[in-house]
Amino acid sequence: DLLRAGRCACENGPHTMVLSASVPDTAALAARLNATGVVKTVIVEETKWPGTVTGLFAHQRAARAFEKLCGWKLDRAAYENVYIHNDWSVLGRYLQDCRAGYILCEDTFGSTLGPDQHLVTDQRAAADFAAKQRGKGYLYWGDSPWCRCVESEDAAKCTLFAADHMVTDSKAALLQSLTEDEKAMVRRVFLTRPLPEKANGATLLLPRSFVADGLMTQNEQDAMFKAVAAKYAAGPLFIKTHPRDATDYQALFPEAVVLERTMPSEVLNFCLPFTFARAVTVQSFVLRGFTAADEKILLTLEEARKLV
């Protein structure tokens, strides 16, 4: 989104970027983003949202509650396009309550093209799906009637939606076309600590939070990722987890280099002076567009659990 904004000059000044206060170190990240001159950030306190509103004029009442408690109001007429990565979030529900006509970004590289789309298919199989299509409640992952279109790495290959509901936005093509100035801008935002110039044979572990998904306890998750690292890590260990993963990986792996959670994993494709010998993840799309490792290992959750 930062790169998109940088390439689309706005006559009214920097583009607006809305950040959830739940993002780690939100204020510091916002300051670095603002310093680029490309975007101006707005921090929204999503945790203050009171929950789903029902009854007469529910969407108007829910929108007003969000604006009052979360600290931001959308002026839809002020923006040509509104983009969001997770329309299941509080902010996504607000956009639906505002009838905003948003564009859903592909959250991870090629995620609309994967074989496992159970979140969408399960949603469509629910008994209340038709009612929600008529605006009675919320729909996510691009199914909302207030979602204008869905971005995909290759819209022609996506079978989830009708062709007129899709648009191609290739992150691979974008990353391949970056100028040195654009790369430097991204590094200034997302690389906040010195990194080693050399890391021969390094392994990159890319965890995510299964605790947040209710699939295991924190202790179980810690034990699982320690077992994954013990099995697959060789050489120096680097860790880059998902922004919503609150695990303290520095405490779990004291000798590892722990990268910023807020950094998109794609940044690693060009920001380091070396490539990793191996990159390992568990039940994630994160390695699809990843080019900075000689070997990529994707484990299922079941495979990872068996290592403990």
Regions picked out by a protein language model, each given a short descriptive name:
Residues 1-142, 270, 285-289:
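Active-site and donor-binding regions of nucleotide-sugar-utilizing enzymes
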